[in-house]
Amino acid sequence: MKLLISNDDGISALGIRTLANALAEVGHDVTVVCPDRERSATGHGLTLHQPIRAEIVESIFHPAIKAWACDGTPSDCVKLALWALLDSPPDLVLSGINQGANLGTEILYSGTVSAAMEGMIEGIPSIAFSLTSHISRNFQPAAKFATILVEQLAAKPIPDLMLLNVNIPPVEWEEIAGVKLTRQGVRRYVDVFDKRTDPRGKTYYWLTGEVLEEVEPPEGLNLPQNVPIDVHAVKDNYISITPLQYNLTYATALDKLSNWNFPMS
């Protein structure tokens, strides 16, 4: 298969190198276009008021891989690849392997998920891969599963245009409990802004924080209650696969709001 791979951790990240090399080694046609530096939590931002530059990168990836480092956002990278760098569209757009989870409401901030979302917006099935640890450097189990999943999709394509958000627990392959199709949960954080002063006396802030709670999604979303939540599945050492779309319409609210009146005079 022809694969486009991006990320938000940057060109030097071990996760994207492990993923791209694993897929190239089994014969896939792999192209990498990703940020030239760390771009985590940039969401779906695009660069509009300055030029975007991309340079070919050698000696980082498998010899069969063509790679570019781009000074834009993850979404910039995918858009640039699809419209300017590639000769023809890929069969799949992949993003990751991210260093850290992309679960629940985190996906709204995620550059990893947004890169894959950009592929889906352009009509290409896409997958975001994340290792649910900021510490573990063992991306091999995640890359192994990615290879299995891509091979499966080559034989049996995704039935509808969608994004698969895949989170892999940070354990050895033998310790993975299995794979679960999941629904998006909620992750809430205690946000802390660390206030500091620079040498010129100007105030600046560092955003820090930690997970406060992992809770059920709000009621009324019309989600199947018999499907497990992503954050719970990963806690139990399952690989979580959540199908996503870019349409954010709150469908059940349309009926709830249908009796509203909007007098214009």
UniProtKB/Swiss-Prot annotation:
Gene Ontology, cellular component aspect: cytoplasm
Enzyme class: hydrolase
Free-text cofactor note: Binds 1 divalent metal cation per subunit.
SUPFAM superfamilies: SurE-like
Enzyme Commission no: 3.1.3.5
Binding-site residues for a divalent metal cation, renumbered to this chain: D8, D9, S40, N98
MF terms (GO), sorted A to Z: 3'-nucleotidase activity; 5'-nucleotidase activity; exopolyphosphatase activity; metal ion binding; nucleotide binding
InterPro entries: SurE, SurE-like_Pase/nucleotidase, SurE-like_sf
Keywords: Cytoplasm, Hydrolase, Metal-binding, Nucleotide-binding
Principal location class: cytoplasm
Cofactor(s) this protein requires: a divalent metal cation
UniProt-annotated location(s): Cytoplasm
Recorded catalytic activity of this chain's protein: a ribonucleoside 5'-phosphate + H2O = a ribonucleoside + phosphate
Similarity remark: Belongs to the SurE nucleotidase family.
NCBIfam families according to UniProt: PRK00346.1-4, PRK00346.2-2, surE
Function as written in the Swiss-Prot or TrEMBL entry: Nucleotidase that shows phosphatase activity on nucleoside 5'-monophosphates.
Protein name per its UniProtKB record: 5'-nucleotidase SurE
